[in-house]
Amino acid sequence: MPTPGNILCLPHNPAAFSEMLEIVAALMQSGRYHPIFIFDGSGYDAAMQVCEQQGITYCITRKPSASNRSQPGDAGATKRPQRRSNASRIFSWVKKTFLVQLVLAWFQYALVWRRARRLLNTLNPQALLLIGDRHIGLETALVELANRRGIPSLIIPFALSDRDSAAVYRLAMPDWRRTYGMERWLNRMVVRLHPEWGFTQNGETLLWQPPAAVLAAAFWRMMPANPWVLGGGAGWVMAVESHHSKDNFILQGMSDEKITIAGKPRYDRAAKIWQQRVEARQHLCAEWGIDPEKKLLVCAVPQLGEHDLLPWDQHWAETEFLFSVFSDLLPHTNVVLSLHPKSNFAEYAPRAERYGLVIAHQSYDQLIPISDVFVAAYSSTVTLAIAAHIPVIVVDFHNFDYDFFNDVKGIIIVRQREKFVSTLQHILKDQAFYQQLVDGQARAAQFWARFDGKATQRILDLIGDLVTRGEEIRKLPPRERRTQLPPWSR
């Protein structure tokens, strides 16, 4: 029996790790492949524990570095200002100059390039499994080096993504005008030289990353051709969850030929639960100590603080508002909270307990199929609610105004706090209105998700095809290999 071939799985962040687990488990079960998780950076402690428990191989490419980013527990804390020496001030100023930043970025990416090359030399993979091909760093370095060797790459995005949301995220940064905007002549010059690295949102042209970063990345062939699109780099194929996802990426400029509709592997388990939702609901409600006959509201707690979209004090204020509204629904309606992998359970648990709310330890794909109403921010989890015909309230009190769900008749977007309670009551108490929303989700479901429980198998078949194609290309002389790659990967 041949030795299973290595598949390198680069999740990019802990949330992506959770989404990749279904595929990795299926790869191991097939016996044909040996998946290896690549953890690059910090935040993967829980992921490493899961790997050890399930016997999954993983590799740490570099030691996690301490972060100065504020944590939830720091919100509102008062820090005593420290006096800085003149030498410290001068050093800080020098670090901000373009030439120094360019040199630092060049050496940083040189080290990344070296790590990527060592991974490929040591592990000799048959394919790469990624969540994108545009994240400058190990992701784009692996894709470029793999393309040179004829090693295929498969992108499986797990989150909603478009250029507008990426721009809104940058516009929320305190110093966005100098960092990403056109205030500095360097930024303007780079956009003139490479218009594809810029994007205009609300009349403001933004650079994907600061000038030093994109220029250094371009030198090392790590800069994606179209960074504002999740699949805008040099990966071979992208497997998306639905017709909506495919249309969305094509609208952003991706090639139709690069995209295939496979469904979302994480939803395979959800599809089975949905088919047996009565029994599944009774089981979980018994575990939580709540009545399964009462209506069940599931809330994916927004992560505006975790994603730096709000200061932590404002994030907690928003969270407390939602919790207080949910508390008022008790005991006539059951409420269960679902936390994002980036969220710290210890920070949320006391607040939830104060309002008498349950935080589920189960993942969202176990909760949404058994719910009656789903509340979330703009989240990819909403697509599962569409697939399961569950009415949704999207809370957008800060008017991010993404247009992901504007045309879905089973989703209500609430942009004003004062309308949230009345909207909830309307859904929970007006059965005719509730049924309208259910019917709206049912009509949208075929366009938004492939919910047949076969997505993982389609992904495995696709990986098999790519591995075979890669083996054929690697038989060619090195100079001919690149010509046989997809046009966007050459």
Where are these regions (language model features)?
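Structural motif
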Residues: 6, 126-127, 237, 296, ...
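Active-site and donor-binding regions of nucleotide-sugar-utilizing enzymes
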Residues: 8-28, 38-54, 60-269
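Conserved catalytic-core segment of nucleotide-activated headgroup transferases in glycan assembly
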Residues: 20, 26, 259, 265-347
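A generic structural motif
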Residues: 29-37, 330-335, 357
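Donor nucleotide-activated moiety binding/catalytic core segment of transferases
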Residues: 113-114, 120, 336-388
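A donor-sugar binding/catalytic signature common to diverse glycosyltransferases
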Residues: 163, 240, 245, 250, ...
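C-terminal amphipathic helix plus adjacent low-complexity
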Residues: 302, 417-490
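Catalytic binding pocket for nucleotide-activated donors in carbohydrate/polymer assembly enzymes
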Residues: 349-353, 380-450
